[in-house]
Amino acid sequence: MSKPVILTYEGLKKLEEELEYLKTVKRAEVAEKIKQARAFGDLSENSEYDEAKNEQAFIEGRIATLEAMLKNAKVIDEEDIKLDQVSIGCTVKVYDESYNEEVEYTIVGSAEADPMNNKISDESPIGKALLGKKVGDVVSVEVPAGIIKLKILEIRK
């Protein structure tokens, strides 16, 4: 049995939309590129054809990955998110003692992690350290830049 892919409802919708886009729009675009490249003649030295076939393989691989993820998806129901401790699906405001600043993180499954938008995986060092902790707790986390201390200020949906 495959490992469940933990997703928020928002993450599920994004993956479903990406899958639909790849299956409808991108597949058709690549098929047209392949058709045009074939019209150039000799396929043995046809870089346009090779590029289109590589793009097709990438898209088909991504489609297969998304289908597998969605098949094994376990969606976190917002009603099930408890605010007494940090869990997947909640947003946590922390005070970073190392950098003297407040930061907010949304804890998500690894499939929808987006660190640039402060959506961190439950499997990341910070995500692991925060899971199960309560408001007022202080955690030390080893990150590439060293060890940071985070004090949990607020937990919300």
From Swiss-Prot:
Coiled-coil segments = 12-74
What one GO molecular function would you report for this record? RNA polymerase binding
Signal sequence residues:
none
- A Pfam family matched in the record: GreA_GreB_N
A Gene Ontology biological process in which this protein takes part is:
DNA-templated transcription elongation
tRNA processing as a keyword of this entry, yes or no, is: no
Alphabetical keyword list: Coiled coil, DNA-binding, Transcription, Transcription regulation
Q: Mind telling me which PROSITE patterns this protein's record contains?
A: GREAB_1, GREAB_2
Q: Which InterPro entries match?
A: GreA/GreB_C_sf, TF_GreA/GreB_CS, Tscrpt_elong_fac_GreA, Tscrpt_elong_fac_GreA/B, Tscrpt_elong_fac_GreA/B_C, Tscrpt_elong_fac_GreA/B_fam, Tscrpt_elong_fac_GreA/B_N, Tscrpt_elong_fac_GreA/B_N_sf
Family membership, please give it: Belongs to the GreA/GreB family.
- Function according to Swiss-Prot or TrEMBL: Necessary for efficient RNA polymerase transcription elongation past template-encoded arresting sites. The arresting sites in DNA have the property of trapping a certain fraction of elongating RNA polymerases that pass through, resulting in locked ternary complexes. Cleavage of the nascent transcript by cleavage factors such as GreA or GreB allows the resumption of elongation from the new 3'terminus. GreA releases sequences of 2 to 3 nucleotides.
The name on file for this protein is Transcription elongation factor GreA
Source organism per UniProt: Thermoanaerobacter pseudethanolicus (strain ATCC 33223 / 39E)
The gene is greA
